[in-house]
Amino acid sequence: MSESLNYYVTAYYRFTKLADLPAIQKALEDKAEELNVKGLVILGDEGYNSTCAASSIESFEAWKTFIREYFNSPDQFFKDSESTKSPFRRFKVKVRNEIVTTGIPGVMPPEGVNHHLSPTEWNKVMKEETDYVMIDTRNWYEYKIGTFKGALNPNIEKFTEFPQYIEAQGIPKDKKMLIFCTGGIRCEKGILELQDKGYNNVFQLDGGILNYMKEYPNDQFEGECFVFDHRVAVDQNLQPTTKFGLCPHCGQPSTIKIECKRCDAHELICEDCIKVEYAKDTCSKNCAYQLEKHPARKGQKQLVPFEIEKMKAEGKDTGSIPQIRVTRTKYISLNKNGEAETRSTKETAE
């Protein structure tokens, strides 16, 4: 890996029966603190789903070794990349009924291969075959910023709507169907649902878009890939997007640049919120609220946690950052570790 990049990132998951989730959660949290690993782990009875990052290659590799050994999964598949931007501010474990929200808890994908296509096999189908249908299983906003050539857009808000979409299309049960998602985990359950409904000629992209772009950048996938962390999206080289931001009003990917009428900050707004009064002219919900109440009054620039992390990643001085008021009762400041922290009172973060 290049020494010029600041963060090493890996995405991984595994469907496996787990017990004593509180003990597992503590073990993960303790190890992450020891190695200074940041990230998110979704933990459940059916397994784990995670993206984590570290600023040193030693900690990065040690974390992956720990995961393999702790979960007794020597063949654990990690989708590694590098980033100039910190994907996470902290490490967090969330315990949920499903490690990926599909609406079909209790369904356990089988061990091994279930109609998986490697990136090479996927490319071969796309370039040499014509009698198939390809469907993007992700949400509409993920599709919008990037997808495979010729992929259909289900235009869904959540994955639980996907099986109903397939049935409504009247696709023949024996038609060759290719499905894909960001990292592969949604398709692991999605393909089971389709097979249960009689679609037995369905194939899924092994490792998802992230695995494909690592092997075939600038090939059959067009645009960028949305990710659920502070990078927002990654480009064809798996680097943090320079094009998209998250709309401060609704959280959707955004590209429209505005200058806040209240605090003069620059922000990216989505196509929907740019049509909404007060939202279209402001960089945050707080500024929108204040602009509506006091149209002629200017205010202090808003500074959100990931902007502080960006300043740190760029080597800028954060020691003089003031506490920033983001709502009537919430402030952002730096704690003793130099991390952004939201507090409910105006006092120094500990």
UniProtKB/Swiss-Prot annotation:
Listed GO MF terms: oxidoreductase activity, acting on paired donors, with incorporation or reduction of molecular oxygen
Highest taxon of source: Bacteria
BP GO terms, sorted: tRNA modification
Keyword Oxidoreductase: yes
E.C. no: 1.14.-.-
Catalytic activity as recorded in UniProt: uridine(34) in tRNA + AH2 + O2 = 5-hydroxyuridine(34) in tRNA + A + H2O
Residue ranges of domain Rhodanese in the record: 128-221
Record's keyword terms, sorted: Oxidoreductase, tRNA processing
Active site: 181
InterPro entries: Rhodanese-like_dom, Rhodanese-like_dom_sf, Rhodanese_C, TrhO, TRHO_N
Entry similarity comment: Belongs to the TrhO family.
HAMAP family the UniProt entry points to: TrhO
Function of the molecule: Catalyzes oxygen-dependent 5-hydroxyuridine (ho5U) modification at position 34 in tRNAs.
Name of the protein in its database record: tRNA uridine(34) hydroxylase
Gene: trhO
